[in-house]
Amino acid sequence: MSIHLSVLGSGSAGNSTLVSISNQDNGQPDRRPFNLLIDLGLSLKQTRLRLEGHGVSIDQIDAVILTHLDQDHLRPVWRNTLQAHQIPVHIHQIHASAASRILAAETIVSYEEEIKLESIIKIRPVQLAHDTTGTIGFVIEAHSKRLGFATDLGHVPNELLEHFVDLDAIALESNYDPDMQRAADRPAFVKQRVMSGHGHLSNAEALDAITRIAARSNLDHVVLIHLSRQCNCPEVVSRLWQQQAPDLHARLTIADQHAPTELLQLGPPVAMAELF
């Protein structure tokens, strides 16, 4: 029994992550995994291609959960596909009204507290600051394994640190390098928004948060997501972690805008043939 995670793409041009959860039991040994997508910010074509690289098709997506409704996390083009495949989209109630103007009503599942999917999956949300409408982080739990996921958060509140305990893996935004942000050729109001505490996390803020979370977890994987194309680069991020958190650096994966990460496993090894 295991959880697999792949960030299909992450950045200002689009975000989507596959979480594939082993769904076998003694009565149904050949049952395929439960496939969950976090966010729908990539094009249909790119999502299909990147899923197929992991042996998953669109019609094998069982559910979607959204962090928030910015277009790099939800593209309106998904509306008809979600309807056609009858894929439920779980949306926190703070975003549900706005989502109804983008998605078909019958695909929207509004929630406030914990979500239970199948009999084995629990998703516990936490509200976070981002621009005016906020964003939602999650702990996804199955088979006694726990994945923490949060992106587009302006700062790391105590509520998130209290929520993200006993994790086996974490995916957290590491959006910008402050020096690159200040030097960037972009309007001052954009820089202020990003760095305001209601915009995005810097590399140092992400490292500090994950270091604190790691002290109360047993992390197999650390995945950094939503790197700014203009104000960050993987080399800067990797160097920071090598210098300040070398033990965690060995478990580090930096997500890319243009290619999916490998399937990262939480739990005991499972042969790929058994998964898909």
For each predicted feature, which ranges?
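Conserved beta-strand hairpin/beta-sheet module of binuclear metal-dependent hydrolase folds
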Residues: 1-54, 136-151, 169
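Structured catalytic core of nucleotide-sugar glycosyltransferases
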Residues: 6-17, 67-76, 96-100, 123-125
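Active-site metal-binding loops of divalent metal-dependent hydrolases
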Residues: 9-10, 40-42, 69, 128-131, ...
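Active-site metal-binding motif and surrounding structural segment of the metallo-beta-lactamase
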Residues: 33-34, 43-91
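Active-site neighborhood of phospho(di)ester-bond hydrolases with catalytic His/Asp-centered motifs
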Residues: 37-41, 61-70, 90-93, 148-151, ...
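Metal-dependent catalytic neighborhoods of phosphoester/phosphodiester hydrolases
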Residues: 74-85, 101, 232-239
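Metallo-beta-lactamase
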Residues: 91-144
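Cap/insert and terminal regions of metallo-dependent hydrolase folds
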Residues: 158-256
